[in-house]
Amino acid sequence: PRIYTYGHRNPQGITFRPGTNQPYVAENGPWHTDEVTALVAGGNSGWDPRPNIGGRGACPDNYCGYSPNQMGAVDPKVRSAFMPMTDTKTYPNAMKPAWTNDGLSQGLFAGTFLTGPQWKTWNGRMIIGFAGIGIHGTPVGNRLDVLDIAADGLSATRTTVSLPMPAARFPSLVQGPEGNL
């Protein structure tokens, strides 16, 4: 298809899983859940910020993507249910994310898969960086997560890497020719 997938909100980057070449997208959610999703040709990512669906009423400018506002101290789980990143109620066949940020966005950036024996148990796992927005007690920057994505691409476990350095953002993660990140 000319359009590989649709229904995305804010993709930050696409990377390909070594060995399978399965594409994965890292995507920012609207004041809540960030996601990593395996892409499927013709797949719908399930983002639909229209008013008057899924229990929502009218929204400013007919766009519900920022409602309810995170600054309003709305519980992240309540906010996520109101405007889900992947709306499986409206789109039951939407591509399911392998990993989400548990309803509290921290500004996910693009990721890459780590390759090479120097990565030991992390070889073949995806690493993602965060901007860190510092709301509701979240840290500002200085965070990398390593995701062990299941072979079917439908689930993942996370290891958060703490770095001994001042807060920093990681908008682009790339392995160099020698395998260093």
Question: Which residues fall in each region the model found?
Answer:
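Blade-level signature of beta-propeller repeat domains, shared across WD40, Kelch, NHL, RCC1
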Residues: V174-L181
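Short, flexible active-site loop motifs that bind/organize anionic cofactors or intermediates
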Residues: L163
